[in-house]
């Protein structure tokens, strides 16, 4: 089990981070305190009076209902609400689907989107459980793209050791030292070192309840600490599962190195933001 977890971590370190572009010039990095006390998705998740939630309608598939967490990710949540209310997501697609990992959408392939990017927002009580709603990012910057965790396989972190992660941190820092601090290579390797440092921090702060939930419902804990989790699916899991089971082919958006592009377009008809009463 530990070997499988490590393999997942090594893969995840590049799978989402390098998959998207972004506009603007925000400084990479977290913009919130991960230890801030909030009610996140680590406990029971249900809609309560006053909650903000999104209903995403996918053509020929149905609706996915997502509880939003503005307390955990104020910038990210408001950005998504503004985009949804403006109709930005209408007609966009799920352009990338990886079974037992995530389904990603919201990319503007025209390159005409003028959305200011912003840093990630993380919290120990917001985790990548099955159905988590998150921002894809490029070197620490969020913009318009999101993903929904579709991995239902049990994740057992009860005896996980972070020693291998320490080795990865040191390795990337050693690589970075070979380059000028103003170079792209230095920036890339230090980003990777910080990626693993953030991941280690989140694993070390994974309490027993969080470990138990990962074991029960599944998810991708190897992404914790490096992506903004700002929502949690509460209804429409069957729709998510259908999307996750589609036939895929080589994805040019991933440099042609990944088989993840749905053979038939998965179109988002609309995203409606509501207040639960």
Please identify what each model-predicted range represents:
Residues 2, 22-277:
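Cyclophilin-like peptidyl-prolyl cis-trans isomerases
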Residues 1-8:
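Positively charged n-region of N-terminal signal peptides that target proteins for export
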Residues 12-13:
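Repetitive helical segments and hydrophobic/amphipathic motifs
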Residues 17-21:
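C-terminal motif of bacterial Sec signal peptides marking the signal peptidase cleavage site
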């Amino acid at each position: 089990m530990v070997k499988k977890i490590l393999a997942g971590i090594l893969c995840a370190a590049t799978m989402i981070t390098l998959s998207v572009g972004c506009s603007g010039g925000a400084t990479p990095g977290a913009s919130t305190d991960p230890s801030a006390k909030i009610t996140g998705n680590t406990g029971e998740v249900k809609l309560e009076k006053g909650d903000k939630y999104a209903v995403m309608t996918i053509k020929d598939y149905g609706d996915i209902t997502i509880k939003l967490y503005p307390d955990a990710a104020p910038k990210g949540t408001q950005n998504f609400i503004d985009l949804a209310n403006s109709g930005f997501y209408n007609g966009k697609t799920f352009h990338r689907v990886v079974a037992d990992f995530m389904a990603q959408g919201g990319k503007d392939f025209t390159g005409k989107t003028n959305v200011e990017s912003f840093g990630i927002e993380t919290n120990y009580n917001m985790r990548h459980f099955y159905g988590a709603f998150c921002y894809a990012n490029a070197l620490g910057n969020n913009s318009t793209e999101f993903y929904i965790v579709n991995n239902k396989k049990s994740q057992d972190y009860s005896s996980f050791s972070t020693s291998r992660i320490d080795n990865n941190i040191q390795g990337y820092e050693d690589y970075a030292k070979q380059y000028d601090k103003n170079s792209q290579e230095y920036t890339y390797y230090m980003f990777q070192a910080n990626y693993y440092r953030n991941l280690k921090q989140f694993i070390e702060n994974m309490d027993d309840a969080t470990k138990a939930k990962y074991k029960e419902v599944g998810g991708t804990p190897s992404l914790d600490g490096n992506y903004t989790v700002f929502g949690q699916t509460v209804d429409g899991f069957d729709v998510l599962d259908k999307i996750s089971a589609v036939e895929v082919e080589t994805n040019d958006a991933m440099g042609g190195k990944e088989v993840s592009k749905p053979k038939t377009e998965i179109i988002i008809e609309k995203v409606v933001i509501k207040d639960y009463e």
